[in-house]
Amino acid sequence: MAGLTDKALVRERFRRTLGSYAGEAAVQRAMAQELVSMAARHASGIHFERVLEVGSGSGMLTELMLEAFSIERYTANDLVEESRECLQGIMDRHPEVVFNFLGGDVESLPFLPERRDLVVSNATLQWLDDLETFLGRIADSMAPGGLFLFTSFSSSNMQEIAAILGTALTYRSIAETGELCERYFEVLELREAEITLTFSSPEAVLRHISRTGVNALARKPWTKGRQKEFSDRYRSMFSQAEGVRLTYNPVYCCLRKRQEGSL
């Protein structure tokens, strides 16, 4: 990733969208559902003792995980402290689970919960400054044979926005992601997809982006003139029969920590 991410700005933008995220983030919900399906395919059973979720947000993945698996202890981390409030209602419906919330930037935490047999993260790792260091820390915190499943985005993500405005995030290619993962884990599954959404207008695209927080690094104000220029260019470049398109390029990854003594 080029440059360092302004985590304070990311925190504020996502804090503002906590209430609208679940209703607007259809792609991220589909990614979370696929993450759960991957876990079911690669896990030896449906029971996990210690789970860590990185980037819990509004609780979209949290709820799916607790519905799909038997979990003893669940630790959720998010940059936005208010995520704890979103998760509380979910946890109240699962009193059998020992729950802990770990607020703050996961890259800056002095420690990570240890001996996790499952770590999950949905649509979050693209915000990290140093993915390799993070992968190493996660591997060190996991029990041998534990699974780490994550979704993120690859280099063609939101290519329409990048074509007009330039891109604030420089997404890694799937090859780059795979190379980093192989340094610390056995790669069980790594693939990418393309999801195209259709909106009635460029203005609807901007509303969608605003409500999901994926514009979290956008600093330049949207004047009427700038919005008109954006809309005119977007419509001329990316129109289709039903409106205009927006492309997502999700990545799905399942990793296993190598057994002690194995290469």
From Swiss-Prot:
Its EC number is 2.1.1.197. Belongs to the methyltransferase superfamily. The keyword Phosphoprotein does not apply. It catalyses: malonyl-[ACP] + S-adenosyl-L-methionine = malonyl-[ACP] methyl ester + S-adenosyl-L-homocysteine. It comes from Chlorobium luteolum (strain DSM 273 / BCRC 81028 / 2530). Pathway: Cofactor biosynthesis; biotin biosynthesis. This is Malonyl-[acyl-carrier protein] O-methyltransferase. GO terms for molecular function: carboxyl-O-methyltransferase activity; malonyl-CoA methyltransferase activity; S-adenosylmethionine-dependent methyltransferase activity. HAMAP family: BioC. It is an enzyme of class 2 (transferase). Converts the free carboxyl group of a malonyl-thioester to its methyl ester by transfer of a methyl group from S-adenosyl-L-methionine (SAM). It allows to synthesize pimeloyl-ACP via the fatty acid synthetic pathway. Keywords: Biotin biosynthesis, Methyltransferase, S-adenosyl-L-methionine, Transferase. CDD domains: AdoMet_MTases. InterPro entries: BioC, Malonyl-ACP_OMT, Methyltransf_11, SAM-dependent_MTases_sf. It comes from the Bacteria. GO terms for biological process: biotin biosynthetic process; methylation.
